[in-house]
């Protein structure tokens, strides 16, 4: 059996989703929609057999739709998710769940009350790297986990491949704290459980419409201190890493998927041999989505987990 997906939002994430769905044996693309005609035209050129003319509301209500993927900017997530709930359709939503915390709390309650399969797209919900960290923690491999450090730097924000998504540069719903840090706070939530925000400091440019340039924070989860340092601007390679420090062994993830460990000496790479990490991660996620739709155990974060992350993110940005 294959599952038919309505893809809402045809930007970078929507295009990636289309490409991966097209290659997975358990999914068919029912149709896609974007409010920007140029985005629809671009998608048509890449996937000429797919319907990109049927509006989002009709795709959601269609009796042929088995899953609604929501890849539009964050402030539009709730509207599409609520429409999917009304139509009785399972949902995969991009992160962050939203920007307004009160709205996201109400949405989460509606989603939970519906009993529908639901998930939010955090990178470490199904990736090999996230699984490795959780396994190390559950098995006691760290000894005592004494701290977590999250470090991120972007020479340019938004990143060049995101340049067309102008909203990512704006304070209203963009910024690297929402877009990138949220993945790593989710991983902390997955491994350690809910965190509390102890302190934070965020710097913005002179233009009040633009997103943050620097953000630091301290949090605590399961008694473990978590430190965050994120910034943008300044030449050099981008930095994206999270380190879990233990008394017996420490682990870190760099560049999203590369894993390393140390017992006191130099870092030793433990990254598994995979031909294409992006495709591997996408297929692992799609396999988990199949399990979710079929009511089987899966590792994907639900709206409640995404809400916990959003509450932290918006508190940092407050």
Indicate residue ranges for each PLM-predicted region.
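C-terminal helix-rich "cap/oligomerization" subdomain common to oxidoreductases
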Residues: 1, 26, 67-69, 288-318
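Predominantly a Rossmann-like dinucleotide-binding segment in NAD(P)-dependent oxidoreductases
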Residues: 124-199, 205-208
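Beta-strand-loop-alpha-helix segment that lines the small-molecule cofactor/substrate pocket
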Residues: 66-67, 73-74, 78-125
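Short, conserved SAM-binding/catalytic segment
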Residues: 42-50, 110-114
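N-terminal Rossmann-like dinucleotide-binding module
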Residues: 1-47
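Short acidic low-complexity segments
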Residues: 51-63
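Active-site loop of classical SDR/Rossmann-like NAD(P)-dependent oxidoreductases
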Residues: 35, 273-287
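Contiguous beta-strand/loop segments that form the cofactor/metal-binding neighborhood of enzyme cores
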Residues: 179-180, 185-257, 286-295
């Amino acid at each position: 059996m294959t599952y038919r997906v309505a893809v809402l939002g045809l930007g970078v994430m929507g295009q990636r989703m289309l490409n991966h769905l097209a290659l997975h044996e358990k999914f068919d693309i029912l149709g896609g929609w974007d409010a920007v005609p140029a985005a629809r035209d671009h998608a048509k050129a890449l996937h000429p057999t797919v319907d990109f003319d049927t509006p989002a509301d009709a795709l959601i209500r269609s009796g042929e739709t088995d899953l609604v993927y929501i890849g539009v900017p964050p402030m539009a997530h709730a509207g599409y998710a609520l429409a999917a709930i009304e139509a009785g359709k399972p949902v995969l939503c991009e992160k962050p769940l939203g920007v307004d915390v009160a709205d996201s709390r109400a949405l989460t309650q509606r989603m939970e009350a519906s009993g529908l399969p639901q998930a939010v797209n955090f990178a470490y919900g199904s990736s090999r790297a996230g699984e490795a960290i959780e396994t190390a923690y559950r098995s006691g491999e760290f000894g005592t986990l004494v701290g977590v450090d999250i470090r991120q730097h972007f020479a340019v924000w938004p990143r060049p491949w995101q340049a067309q998504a102008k909203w990512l540069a704006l304070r209203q719903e963009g910024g690297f704290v929402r877009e990138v840090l949220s993945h790593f706070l989710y991983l902390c939530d997955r491994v350690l459980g809910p965190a509390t925000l102890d302190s934070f400091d965020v710097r913005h440019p002179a233009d009040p419409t633009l997103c943050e340039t620097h953000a630091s924070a301290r949090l605590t989860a399961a008694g473990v201190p978590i430190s965050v340092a994120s910034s943008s601007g300044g030449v050099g390679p981008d930095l994206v890493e999270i380190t879990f420090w233990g008394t017996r062994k420490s682990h870190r993830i760099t560049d999203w998927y590369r894993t390393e460990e140390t017992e006191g000496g130099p870092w030793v790479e433990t990254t598994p041999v995979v031909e294409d990490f992006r495709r591997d991660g996408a297929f692992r996620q799609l396999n988990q989505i199949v399990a979710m739709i079929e009511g089987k155990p899966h590792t994907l974060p639900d709206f409640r987990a995404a809400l916990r992350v959003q509450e932290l993110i918006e508190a940092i940005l407050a």
